[in-house]
Each structure stands twice: as C-alpha cells, then as structure tokens.
C-alpha cells in the first residue's frame, strides 16, 4: 500500500518534469526574462547571469537587448571605458546623458583629478571599479583635449596700479563666475578665482578694489598728465608771451604778469602771493568744471588776454590738467583775435600743445562761440590782429587797428558793400558802411549792448591805477561803426 502511494507521487513528479512541451509549463518558465527584478540587479550588470539560473532548468537564449555602444566610434559615457564582456548591455536609464555631457565635467569636480569613479553614484562606485579593473582599459588615462572647460588664474597684483582707480577686467573663460564677494577682503589671488570658477555659463568680471574710495576720474587724469605733460614747465603756445600749463605751484606763477585759473577744484593762489609782488601779478580764478557753460565768460576772458598780450605781458592760462578747459579758452582767443575757424584754431594750438583734448561739451560750446563771432563778424574783423610771429603788435598799433573801421575792412563782405545803393542809405548819416537789413541791425544792437555790459564789468575789475592803461585800451576796442549807429535818431 505504501509502495503504491510512493509510485503515484513519483508519477506526479514525472508528469511535471518530463513534459517540457506542455503549453502550461512554457508559461511558467518566463522564456523572455520579463519578470526579472531589474532593481535588484546592478544597473550596469548583465540582464542574465549564470548565478541567477535555476539548477537543472533548460536555458533559453535571451533576446539581445538594445545596445547603445554598437557604433562606428564607441561613445564614452562620462569618460568611463567600455566594459569588456561577452555580451554588452545598456546602462540604466537614470545614467543616460546627452552627447554634450561627454565633454563637460560635473560642477563639483571641475578642478579635481579625474578618477574612474567620476560622476557615479556612491552605490555604484565599487562595482564600476571592479569592472574597470578587469578591463585592459582600466588605466583610464584620457587625452587632455577632451576636457574643454578651463578655469583661469589671474594674478591681480600684476594688474593693479598704485594710485589708479579700480578697473574692471573681463575673463574670457567658458565657465566662470563673478567673485565680487571676495573683493571685500582685499586683492584677489589665483585660488580665489579658481574657487569661484565652478558655476556654469557665467562670465567673470573681476572688480579690483580701489585704494581710495574718494578717488575720481579728474584726480586720475591729473596724476597721469602731470607726469607726462608739461615736463619742462609752462608751454609757450602763442609767442611771445602766452603760456599753457597744468596745475601750477606758487613759485610757478610768480614769474607771470597775468594768471588765469579756469579750474574750480584748483585753489585760488592770489592770497598766497607775497605782498611785494601782489601789485605786479593780476590773478583771475574762474570756477569752471568740465560741464560748465563757458560761453558766457569767453568774451570777457579773451579780451583780458588780448589786452595783456598786446602790452607784452607774460600770461599763464591753466586748469588742472592743462588739456581741456584752459586749452578751450586759448582756442576761443585764437578764434576771436586771429580770425580763424574752430578747426583752424584748434589745429594751430594742437600743433604746439600735442596733448590738448577738450571734451565734447566744450567743443560744442566753442562751436556756439564761433557762431556768435560769425554773426558779429564786422565788429570782430576790426579786432582781428596779425600773428605775433609775423608782426609784433604794440599798443599804438592795437589802438589804430581797433579804431580803423573803414570800408576796406568790408572788402571781404561783398554782399554788405553792394547794399550801398539801398534806399536806406538816406537815413544813415554815418560815413561808414553799416548793416542795412532789420535783422542785421537788430543783431548788431544786441551784440553791442552785450559787449558794453561786459566792458563795464571789466572796467570795474581793472579800476586800480596800475591797470588804467588796460581799461583805456579795452574801452577803445569797441569804438566801431555799430557803436556810432546806436546814437543815430
């Protein structure tokens, strides 16, 4: 009886083991490996391993999975060498990256030495190391050209100039950041730049610290120009006695008869002149800045310069640097008393003082000054003097030049001369040729009124006995035909 039951039990096992073609048995075998626990396996391990096979079971070949490495040129994933195995398998989907990531190191490893465990999770470091150790390519020595990202090291101590304001410099790296916070500590060094070079897709602008928080651009220009311009002292720009200079010292101005300071930031040295020389030196302090409206002062200042120049006095015109404001005043003087245009006057001064460079605001005001001179051209023509190097002008010659306002002065104005046959001639009792049109007449009267107001102010400033001759010459210089016309009924 016992034998019969054992035989039935054996027959039941035989029915299961020796019917491999049964459809039910095929359903239990999972021939396509669809029910394997992939999460339990390593992401880079094979889908099927001999250790996972059931002893005594029939092995069916697994279908070949998708192979990402079968290309003409194998793609290296994150610089990891391909695993040598009988059947290559795809990596886990979480490890797949775009082709562009092959050439870029991760953020946290930009400045570290590349190792076989680069950019791998902590759970897979040991397994990848084992795989790479069994491979002939386990040395993992990649060529430097694959690393396309470079961080720059800048030694700022070579770029920083003493006494010069902080400058900004752009670092042309592919992936750097802005280490502005580190500038609070002081000068950056190479380690500071590398520390902040880990962020992506940013361009670095290093802002070097300033030595003085109150340092401005005028002080920088003054320091530069005082070292490179006017090395031999005041420069003679209009012979024989008109000089251009930057900020002078007290001993520099003691050798001049007239000093015009047109810089607001330069202190007035008039009160420092010794008493025994105060009567000899005439000092004017005009508080101009780089954005001042200088046109309103040009008429008075150019007349003061012209009076002293014609008397042979030694004149010094200066500002802080001697290249912008003071140069503009001398250009205005040349335009008025040498009868030159703005370009010609500027080129004349530029030929002597190579470093002059008025800013555009002053240039535009000189253009306005030239327009004013062209509108008052008959009056200015009588005040035009010859070049000093061609003809030395004395006081008598200046008086005769300013007084002689004959018709010969208008030979360069044929349109005005042709108006002598105008019906308005009968209403003019002056023997001089005068403007005939209402617009010209109104402009002449306005210019004369402005000129007389400036002359009154100038006469008050020159009321001392020592300057009586200057005042007389200045008053005579406006005795022109427009002045005579003002007294007509």
Swiss-Prot record:
Q: Could you tell me the gene encoding this protein? A: MSG5
Listed GO MF terms: MAP kinase tyrosine phosphatase activity; MAP kinase tyrosine/serine/threonine phosphatase activity; protein tyrosine/serine/threonine phosphatase activity; protein tyrosine/threonine phosphatase activity
- Where is this chain compositionally biased, Basic and acidic residues type? 1-18, 451-460
Q: Which organism is it from?
A: Saccharomyces cerevisiae (strain ATCC 204508 / S288c) (Baker's yeast)
Residue spans of biased composition, Low complexity class: 419-450
Expression is induced as follows: By pheromone.
User: What is the name listed in the Swiss-Prot or TrEMBL entry for this protein?
Assistant: Tyrosine-protein phosphatase MSG5
- What's in the GO CC field? cytoplasm; nucleus
List, alphabetically, the SUPFAM superfamilies matched. Answer: (Phosphotyrosine protein) phosphatases II (SSF52799)
> What are the entry keywords?
Cell cycle, Hydrolase, Phosphoprotein, Protein phosphatase
This enzyme catalyses: O-phospho-L-tyrosyl-[protein] + H2O = L-tyrosyl-[protein] + phosphate
Spell out the family assignment given in the record's similarity comment.
Belongs to the protein-tyrosine phosphatase family. Non-receptor class dual specificity subfamily.
């Amino acid at each position: 009886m016992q034998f019969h039951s054992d035989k039935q039990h054996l027959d039941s096992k035989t029915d299961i083991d020796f019917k491999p073609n049964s459809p039910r048995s095929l359903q239990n075998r999972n021939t396509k490996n669809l029910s394997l626990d992939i999460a339990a396996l390593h992401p880079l391990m094979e889908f099927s391993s001999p250790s996972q096979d059931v002893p005594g079971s029939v092995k069916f070949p697994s279908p070949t999975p998708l192979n990402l490495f079968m290309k003409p040129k194998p793609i290296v994933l994150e610089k990891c060498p391909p695993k040598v195995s009988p059947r290559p398998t795809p990596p886990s989907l979480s490890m797949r990256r775009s082709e562009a990531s092959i050439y870029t190191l991760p953020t946290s490893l930009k400045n570290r030495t590349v190792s076989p465990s680069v950019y791998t999770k902590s759970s897979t470091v040991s397994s990848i190391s084992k795989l790479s150790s069994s491979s002939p390519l386990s040395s993992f020595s990649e060529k430097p050209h694959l690393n396309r990202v470079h961080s720059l090291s800048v030694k700022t101590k070579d770029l920083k100039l003493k006494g010069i304001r902080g400058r900004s410099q752009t670092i042309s790296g592919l992936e750097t950041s802005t280490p502005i916070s580190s500038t609070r500590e002081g000068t950056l060094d190479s380690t500071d730049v590398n520390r902040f070079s880990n962020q992506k897709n940013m361009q670095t602008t290093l802002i070097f610290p300033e030595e003085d928080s109150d340092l401005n651009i005028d002080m920088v220009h003054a320091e530069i120009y005082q070292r490179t311009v006017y090395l031999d002292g005041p420069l003679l720009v209009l012979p024989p006695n008109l000089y251009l200079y930057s900020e002078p010292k007290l001993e520099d101005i003691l050798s001049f008869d007239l000093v015009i300071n047109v810089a607001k930031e330069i202190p007035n040295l008039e009160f420092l002149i010794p008493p025994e020389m105060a009567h000899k030196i005439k000092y004017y302090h005009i508080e101009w800045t780089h954005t001042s409206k200088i046109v309103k002062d040009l008429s008075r200042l150019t007349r003061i310069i012209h009076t002293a120049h014609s008397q042979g006095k030694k004149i010094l015109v200066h500002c802080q640097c001697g290249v912008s404001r003071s140069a503009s005043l001398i250009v205005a003087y040349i335009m008025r008393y040498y009868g030159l245009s703005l370009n010609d006057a500027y080129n004349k001064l530029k030929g002597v003082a190579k470093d002059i460079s008025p800013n555009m605001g002053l240039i535009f005001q000189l253009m306005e000054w030239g327009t004013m001179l062209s509108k008052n051209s008959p009056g200015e023509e009588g005040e035009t003097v010859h070049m000093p190097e061609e003809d030395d002008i004395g006081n008598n010659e200046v008086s005769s030049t300013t007084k002689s306002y004959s018709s010969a002065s208008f030979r360069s104005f044929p349109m005005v001369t042709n108006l002598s046959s105008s019906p308005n001639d009968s209403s003019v009792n002056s023997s001089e040729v005068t403007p005939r049109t209402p617009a010209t007449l109104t402009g002449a009267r306005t210019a004369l009124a402005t000129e007389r107001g400036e002359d009154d102010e100038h006469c008050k400033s020159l009321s001392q006995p020592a300057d009586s001759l200057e005042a007389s010459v200045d008053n005579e210089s406006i005795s022109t035909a427009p002045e005579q016309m003002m007294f007509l009924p």
